[in-house]
From Swiss-Prot:
One of its GO terms (molecular function) is UDP-glucosyltransferase activity. Disulfide bonds: none annotated. Belongs to the UDP-glycosyltransferase family. It comes from Arabidopsis thaliana. The lineage of its organism: Eukaryota, Viridiplantae, Streptophyta, Embryophyta, Tracheophyta. CDD domains: GT1_Gtf-like (cd03784). Keywords: Glycosyltransferase, Transferase. It is an enzyme of class 2 (transferase). Its EC number is 2.4.1.-. UDP-alpha-D-glucose binds at residues 261, 320-322, 337-345, 359-362. This is UDP-glycosyltransferase 79B5. Pfam families: UDPGT (PF00201).
Length: 448
């Protein structure tokens, strides 16, 4: 048993980063460690319900200074449009005095961070360990370390040439609006910290992890996916209305589509998507947010669509219980955006997987799973990012048709990978070993 430690956490102020950091904080608290979690004031209310150990995890609100481009009252990445997140970076960069004051007062053993480059330098001044914890994929971290890969030109020693952005993706899906200055700052944090860690596992991204270790010249620690307990293992059951509806179809025949609560289609692409689902001729259930500029999903549906598909298709506005739906025997295919949670729910299900990625990290993971591991397929898109109803229909049918060669290939590969991922203790073992490694780091610091 290692020494109990006190950790600071200073994640990027986006909910897609703060929530995974809180999952890790819960794991540390479960093992008896204390966490001081830095966050903007307005995030406190949304994150509080996810804090499973409020006696051990203390939220410490920070006040962002005014900077150019940061609207009054904006404190998180979701307060700014996707095209311009830089003001949050600049504001977080200016919080060093507030963080240092807390370090002096509370004397932590470790500080976790992801994007703020000066944390390792500050930690060294105070004799504490800096842990760079990346919740983006190893593919994305590797691309940050080899920025030409972001432009579609990975270096010769890049381990997986297929896992890079191409064509329109290098512009449309660029990580931070093509800001090489930000790439440089993130790289500085990765190379100067004491410990590099990523929310992934060797079974998915082993080769890329090796590349990152080589580039950073230090051992890489992996936490595994660090997901909260799945609903289908927590005693919950699928709502009766969905269970009854799904029971009306043959096993493995229903196509389930979900894109999370943070993604919004353009209206014309949403209508094309719906028409593609109709063209398939298969039963389907779609969980989606209203497209941009539309007050409701129903208002945005193609004319006459609901009437034509009412016996075999539902478009539902908002969130559904994904893991419970995926475990229903009637569901045979999962179409999603390759968001982190949906990606993992795909991999541990028995469903065929179709991806329509939207962001850079999602595009890279889709390439890994589709072209390298061949456990999924993706919908083909034009240079603008547009996909047609025929593209969607053909992609889904390629994995749903019994005689499809590609469908049988990805099904075999997916089954094999799933058996590995769900083997007892594999994923939970990553988190346990990660915490043990941190305890050793802290012990070595105390007795050095």
């Amino acid at each position: 048993m290692g020494s109990k430690f006190h950790a600071f956490m200073y994640p990027w102020f986006g909910f897609g980063h703060m929530i995974p950091y809180l999952h890790l904080a819960n794991k540390l608290a479960e093992k008896g460690h204390r966490v001081t979690f830095f966050l903007p004031k307005k995030a406190h209310k949304q994150l509080q319900p996810l804090n499973l150990f409020p006696d051990s995890i203390v939220f410490e609100p920070l006040t962002l200074p005014p900077v150019d481009g940061l609207p009054f009252g904006a404190e998180t990445a979701s307060d700014l449009p996707n095209s311009t997140k830089k003001p949050i970076f600049v504001a977080m960069d200016l919080l060093r005095d507030q963080i240092e004051a807390k370090v002096r007062a509370l004397k932590p053993d470790l500080i976790f961070f992801d994007f703020v480059h000066w944390v390792p330098e500050m930690a060294e001044e105070f004799g504490i360990k800096s842990v760079n914890y990346q919740i983006i994929s190893a593919a994305c971290v590797a691309m940050v370390l080899a920025p030409r890969a972001e432009l579609g030109f990975p270096p010769p020693d890049y381990p997986l040439s297929k896992v890079a952005l191409r064509g329109h993706e290098a512009n449309v899906c660029s990580l931070f609006a093509n800001s090489h200055e930000l790439f440089g700052l993130i790289t500085k944090g990765l190379k100067n910290c004491d410990v590099v860690s990523i929310r992934t596992c060797v079974e998915l991204e082993g080769k890329l992890c090796g590349f990152i270790e080589k580039e950073c010249q230090k051992k890489l620690l992996l936490t595994g996916p660090m997901l909260p307990e799945p609903q289908n293992k927590s005693g919950k059951f699928l709502e009766d209305r969905w269970n009854h509806w799904l029971n009306g179809f043959e096993p493995g025949s229903v196509v389930f589509c979900a894109f999370g609560t943070q993604f919004f289609f353009e209206k014309d692409q949403f209508q094309e998507f719906c028409l593609g689902m109709e063209l398939m001729g298969l039963p389907f259930l779609i969980s989606v947010m209203p497209p941009k500029g539309s007050p409701t999903v129903q208002e945005a549906l193609p004319k006459g669509f609901e009437e034509r598909v009412k016996k075999h298709g539902i478009v539902w506005e908002g969130w559904l219980e994904q893991p419970l739906i995926l475990s229903h025997p009637s569901v045979g295919c999962f179409v999603n955006h390759c968001g982190f949670g949906s990606m993992w729910e795909s991999l541990v299900s028995d469903c065929q997987i179709v991806f329509i990625p939207q962001l850079a990290d999602q595009v890279l993971i889709t390439r890994l799973l589709t072209e390298e591991l061949e456990v999924s397929v993706k919908v083909q898109r034009e240079d603008s990012g547009w996909f047609s109803k025929e593209d969607l229909r053909d992609t889904v049918k390629s994995v749903m048709d019994i005689d499809s060669e590609i469908g049988n290939l990805v099904k075999r590969n997916h089954k094999k990978l799933k058996e590995t991922l769900v083997s007892p203790g594999l994923l939970s073992g990553y988190a346990d070993k990660f915490v043990e490694a941190l305890e050793i780091e802290v012990n070595n610091t105390k007795f050095s």
